[in-house]
A protein has these predicted regions:
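N-terminal single-pass transmembrane signal-anchor helix
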Residues: 1-27, 32
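Generic detector of short alpha-helix boundary/capping microenvironments
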Residues: 15, 43, 102-104
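N-terminal alpha-helical signal peptides/signal-anchor transmembrane segments
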Residues: 28-30, 39-57
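Low-complexity, acidic interaction segments enriched in glycine
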Residues: 48-149
Length: 149
């Protein structure tokens, strides 16, 4: 083999490796998107149970994505306090529920598969609460956000 042939083989292998890595990353993100959509559906069910029991949605009027962990913690606490919505919460995979920001006696937050706390927004006058995942870029209010609406 000549040096040129070896270089051609190395280039072909590098191109193939790049394609495989790119496809694997895309498949991973698609799986995470499906997971977060399923999570939002479970949380929607828990919110409906909460509403059926209390005749109201958990309030959280602040739209400030910097406070998403606090909003998520508030939602978890409210849903956990009602038996019917609590039973829905127990069906959520434990990998989405963590207590990263509080002490052991504070409620957990709800996280998406990328490790970002979900945001929850509901103000008086809204038709339905918004659950928002920041998506793969982990930045709220960007094109890849995933919501329950």
């Amino acid at each position: 083999m000549t040096l040129v042939e070896i270089l051609v083989v190395v280039v072909v292998i590098a191109v193939l490796a790049t394609m495989v890595i790119s496809i694997a990353g895309r498949i991973d993100n698609q799986g995470k998107e499906r997971s977060v959509k399923a999570l939002l559906a479970q949380l929607d069910a828990a919110i409906q149970e909460y509403r059926d029991f209390t005749s109201a949605f958990p309030a959280q009027p602040e739209k400030n994505f910097a406070n998403a962990p606090a909003h998520s913690e508030l939602l978890y606490r409210e849903l956990d306090a009602i038996p019917s919505s609590h039973s829905v919460l127990t069906k959520i995979d434990d990998s989405f529920i963590e207590n990263k920001y509080g002490t052991a006696d504070t409620p957990s937050e709800i996280y998406d598969p990328w490790g970002t706390a979900l945001d929850y927004i509901y103000a008086a006058g809204d038709n339905y609460p918004a659950l928002i995942s920041a998506g793969a870029d982990k930045v709220f209010d960007s094109a890849d956000d995933i919501t329950n609406k």
